[in-house]
Each structure stands twice: as structure tokens, then as C-alpha cells.
Amino acid sequence: MIIFYGTRRTGKVSAREGQYAVTRFAHVYYLPLFPIAGLWITGADRGHVAKVSWKSVIAGYARTWGPLLGLGAMFTGPAGVVAGIGCVVASAATLAWSHVRTPSAQRRSDLNQLAFGTRCEPDLLPRELVDALRPELEARWGEIANGQSPSDVARFGTDDVQRAAVAYGVLRLSALSLPRAQASEAEADAARIADNVRELRQLGDGPYRSP
């Protein structure tokens, strides 16, 4: 008997403008067994390593195992039919995670692209990439700060999308290493900047810029 096994990418979530998160799973007959690594896809045959997204992991399991378990449960009796329908519904529900849907989440995704060169959320970025991006963003902010801090942009606003994107990026990366209370303040300021931005233009070429 030949056992077909290996690794596969599945669990696509948070897609926008051709970018999305997936998880690389060990599989048997294409059925995911356990997650191996997270990936952020930035274009055709391009991407970068990312931390594992729990949404992607759940989606990867639910979209493959869910229908199979649901179908099997339906043959066990009336209670199994109910359980089977529940499995199928739960599997289908993860499709809502496939794309970035709300306007606020879309603006955050766009600002991620402008600031970091990837739409990946900062908490999924690997440490080495954060360590490379943060001094670059802080240096860029130093050139355009005009005596303000990134939090000042959140409080007082700006008509300059470049300043908004860089301030947003500095705040989000800073939040990763701050104590919880300060991190929450930085994230709140970044969210305020995103809420105030309506029209975004490309801010140069990031290392993972999508075509």
C-alpha cells in the first residue's frame, strides 16, 4: 500500500490585492495533520515567512476535515445528521475570513503595504523582518516629523498620506515590544490614523511589494 504524504499550503485568509496568509501543513492524502509554518503570499510564486495565523490554521482544518467529518457523521443517525450539518456550516463559515472585508480593515491593509511593503499584519511578521523595518521607518519618520511624534498625527491628523503611513507603521511596530498598556495606546493611535485616512497612494517600493 502506497501512502501519499508531504506538505501543502492551505488555509487562505485575509486576502487583499493578491496578498494573503496561508499555512504549510504536513498532510496525508492532502488532509492536513499539523501546521509546520506560516507564509504570507505577496504575488505569484512570491512571499515571505510569517508567524502562523490561527485563523489560517482553523480554516485549513475546517475546509478539508469539516466536510469529511460532517458527511461521516450523517450516517450515524439523526443526531449525526445534526452534527454533520454543524460541521459543514462551520467549515463554510471560515470562508468569511478569506478576504479583508470591512473598510477599516482594508485601510489597515493598505497602510501596512505603504509602511512595510507587505499587507501582512505586524503581529504575524517574523522578528528579523520587524528588526529590519523598524529602524528604517523611524529614520524615515525623522525626515518628515516636523517636530511631531507619530501619536501627534493620530491626535491632530494630517493631509499627507506619506506622513500618515509612516507614523502608522512606527506605532504598530513599536506596539510589538511595549508593555501591554502602552502597546494598547500605540495600537489605538494607529487605528485612529487608519480611520482618518480615506485615499492612499503608493509610498515607494517595499521589499515585498505586490505588482
Model-derived regions, located:
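A composition-biased, non-transmembrane "mature-region" signal
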Residues: 1-211
